[in-house]
Amino acid sequence: MNEMTHRTKTRPVKVGNLTIGGNNELIIQSMTTTKTHDVEATVAEIKRLEEAGCQVVRVAVPDERAADAIADIKKQINIPLVADIHFDYRLALKAIEGGIDKVRINPGNIGRRHKVEAVVNAAKERGIPIRIGVNAGSLERHILEKYGYPTADGMVESALHHIKILEDLDFHDIIVSMKASDVNLAIEAYEKAARAFDYPLHLGITESGTLFAGTVKSAAGLGAILNKGIGNTLRISLSADPVEEVKVARELLKSFGLASNAATLISCPTCGRIEIDLISIANEVEEYISTLQVPIKVAVLGCAVNGPGEAREADIGIAGARGEGLLFRKGQVVRKVPEETMVEELKKEIDVIAAEMAAEREKEKETQEQ
């Protein structure tokens, strides 16, 4: 059996201003729910996704109106844009002409070789990568006939078939996804893919469900895959506002220490000792830190006895007691604050630490560029 390719060993592929693969960073992706030809609505949704922490966004391109809108959308957003293309190679060509940053296709359903070659040549000329999207629900007929039903081996065979089409045209800026709605199938498919080739992998559990059920299902499947060192980009697919997809993705990556640009909240589950409204305070603080782009850890705890010790790894936190709270940094009590002002005091400290972290990151960036 081939050795599994860790995410840090995958081939680097440029997508806009991002490098996907060849490092330990996972890029968060989402997809718009608007009609792509409605430029105003699509841009507005992408702006909300950007603010939530989305790093790459995909749009459906089912017709010429959508393809023609790409250029206008690109002018108004700040993150790489991906075109989702099926069947009609001319839509891919139009999207590439409009400045798209990546194309998602299956070379096998684009048609004859000259059509695939036209897309590949256009992508080569612009330095645009292609994502091969393998999906358990739409495997080729000959693969289903061979295996009887969707299997991990069949999905890998499909991926290798599409990869070969591109490689035969001397195209190697490839990203691959191996999506399934069955969690165990997805885990097996991604693991086998990581043993079969070294192209970057885009992770996802497709058709995972509504906000609550889909979050649980995606976290279970993608968590197992991430823990194996697999994956370079990911999307949490939910039947919900796509901003929720980004929020869940950020939380999932934070859980594995794979998000260097997101704040983390530590809060206790509450018990009979609690004498403050911890749940509403935790929700307020979580919302406050949700858009921070630094790895600050914030703790909100209800017990002044155990709180600081339980969250000694937090950069800043509060532990509530009757009528007052303890403000602490790295487990050390800084000062006592009245209960009615402790949340505002915590927010002030968060702002100070976040600014310090941002300045330090900028300094490191300048040093690296010298």
From Swiss-Prot:
Keywords: 4Fe-4S, Iron, Iron-sulfur, Isoprene biosynthesis, Metal-binding, Oxidoreductase
Keyword Metal-binding: yes
GO molecular function: 4 iron, 4 sulfur cluster binding; 4-hydroxy-3-methylbut-2-en-1-yl diphosphate synthase activity (ferredoxin); 4-hydroxy-3-methylbut-2-enyl-diphosphate synthase activity (flavodoxin); iron ion binding
Co-factor remark: Binds 1 [4Fe-4S] cluster.
Alphabetical list of InterPro entries matching this protein: Dihydropteroate_synth-like_sf, IspG_bac, IspG_bac-typ, NO2/SO3_Rdtase_4Fe4S_sf
Cofactor needs: [4Fe-4S] cluster
Pfam families assigned to the protein according to its UniProt record, in alphabetical order: GcpE (PF04551)
Record flagged with keyword Isomerase: no
Residues bound to [4Fe-4S] cluster: 268, 271, 303, 310
Pathway(s) of this molecule: Isoprenoid biosynthesis; isopentenyl diphosphate biosynthesis via DXP pathway; isopentenyl diphosphate from 1-deoxy-D-xylulose 5-phosphate: step 5/6
Gene3D superfamilies: Dihydropteroate synthase-like, Sulfite Reductase Hemoprotein, domain 1
Enzymatic reactions: (2E)-4-hydroxy-3-methylbut-2-enyl diphosphate + oxidized [flavodoxin] + H2O + 2 H(+) = 2-C-methyl-D-erythritol 2,4-cyclic diphosphate + reduced [flavodoxin]
GO biological process: isopentenyl diphosphate biosynthetic process, methylerythritol 4-phosphate pathway; terpenoid biosynthetic process
EC code: 1.17.7.3
Functional summary from the UniProt entry: Converts 2C-methyl-D-erythritol 2,4-cyclodiphosphate (ME-2,4cPP) into 1-hydroxy-2-methyl-2-(E)-butenyl 4-diphosphate.
Family to which this protein belongs: Belongs to the IspG family.
NCBIfam families linked to this entry: ispG_gcpE (TIGR00612), PRK00366.1 (NF001540)
This protein's name: 4-hydroxy-3-methylbut-2-en-1-yl diphosphate synthase (flavodoxin)
Taxon lineage: Bacteria, Bacillati, Bacillota, Bacilli, Bacillales
Gene name as annotated: ispG
